[in-house]
Amino acid sequence: MERWWFNSMLFKKEFERRCGLNKSMGSLGPIENTNEDPNRKVKNIHSWRNRDNSSCSNVDYLFGVKDIRNFISDDTFLVSDRNGDSYSIYFDIENHIFEIDNDHSFLSELESSFYSYRNLSYLNNGFRGEDPYYNSYMYDTQYSWNNHINSCIDSYLQSQICIDTSIISGSENYGDSYIYRAICGGESRNSSENEGSSRRTRTKGSDLTIRESSNDLEVTQKYRHLWVQCENCYGLNYKKFFKSKMNICEQCGYHLKMSSSDRIELLIDPGTWDPMDEDMVSLDPIEFHSEEEPYKDRIDSYQRKTGLTEAVQTGIGQLNGIPVAIGVMDFQFMGGSMGSVVGEKITRLIERAANQILPLIIVCASGGARMQEGSLSLMQMAKISSALYDYQLNKKLFYVSILTSPTTGGVTASFGMLGDIIIAEPNAYIAFAGKRVIEQTLNKTVPEGSQAAEYLFQKGLFDLIVPRNLLKSVLSELFKLHAFFPLNQKSSKIK
């Protein structure tokens, strides 16, 4: 496997002028093959750092690149963009390898050389931030190389590929470059259109023509599994670390959807989870007719897709040693819709919590009542509310409702808003009727953000907005405040 040094910062116009580069150069930047001499890159960096103010010793090694895809498909290259981000990327399509090199000594030398050039340009030309090329993303040393992969790739795409892309025929199609589609999983044209096609990308004063081969779709599918795209900022999150980050976007902090199993793992102590009614499944009580797909077949397909039997998981577990009854809805299963089985499982959970004198947690994530079950799904609202009435008023026990995105419809109108303490996640979409339904029914525009957790909190709709990383500790403190203690602590007090 060959190793290449890729320096896209040479596209800075001022640097081209200093080094006598040709602005019409049709490549992404200087590339040198370090396959022959592994120490060559260190030597070049040293000579670059000690250059005088009007010359650049590395210009002798420049040559053009006609097809960047050749390097992406089976080679390794080191990248430093004009924003100051430096990183080494290894691609191996055949073996599905995509990783970042962990060479901190090389990073420090490489960055210092780029930053010294930037400071030199500031002094000589009087730049003070008005040049858009110098709005750099500084490397944050608190992240390891692997955790920094997302911001590096995103910075590279923004600065090199996604700035201004157009098809040679003249039609505008921004952000549709080969690398962007390969990482984001965008749609690829069919093979007959791909063969021999080309695209010109303008990157800050220079033109790059990228040839697309007929197997773009194959490459796209191979790398699609590596990333999760944020639905708020559209930033890319490396899937390998996404679960450890609790499905929170590293770019903007947005809380993305989370499966019920992941939420149980987040809240319940390991080895203490005891599920309830796992074998309870939905039938077709009203023989719902659908031209697209029968209701039973749809249930079966979601069961295979999610590994769940229904849109809620219920059970008993321990939260920091405190026994709790918990139900977690899963939006991935038919939009978390509430049918007869969901209502029955939650009702049984409440009754068991009342009998065993346990605090109750219900994590809501639902689109509302399930239309395929008609009035049977609507009656679950009254059934669950009746069970909660006995639990809260007669048994005097403690119920915490956690509203996640989205929580709408019948769940919002029933047990979602009946908690003694109502907690919402940041940025959660919480409503009775959705924005589209309201606008179509009333023919009025719903203000942006009027159904977001932050706005509703100001109106007093719930008690707390708690980020995921603090949720378990906040719940633990609430339970202790209401005289629910860990098992070992409770037994020691009795003695």
Curated annotation (Swiss-Prot):
Signal peptide: none annotated. Residues 226-495 form the CoA carboxyltransferase N-terminal domain. It is found in: Plastid, Chloroplast stroma. Its EC number is 2.1.3.15. Residues 188-208 are annotated as: Disordered. It is an enzyme of class 2 (transferase). GO terms for biological process: fatty acid biosynthetic process; malonyl-CoA biosynthetic process. GO terms for molecular function: acetyl-CoA carboxylase activity; ATP binding; carboxyl- or carbamoyltransferase activity; zinc ion binding. Acetyl-CoA carboxylase is a heterohexamer composed of biotin carboxyl carrier protein, biotin carboxylase and 2 subunits each of ACCase subunit alpha and ACCase plastid-coded subunit beta (accD). Component of the acetyl coenzyme A carboxylase (ACC) complex. Biotin carboxylase (BC) catalyzes the carboxylation of biotin on its carrier protein (BCCP) and then the CO(2) group is transferred by the transcarboxylase to acetyl-CoA to form malonyl-CoA. This is Acetyl-coenzyme A carboxylase carboxyl transferase subunit beta, chloroplastic. The gene is accD.
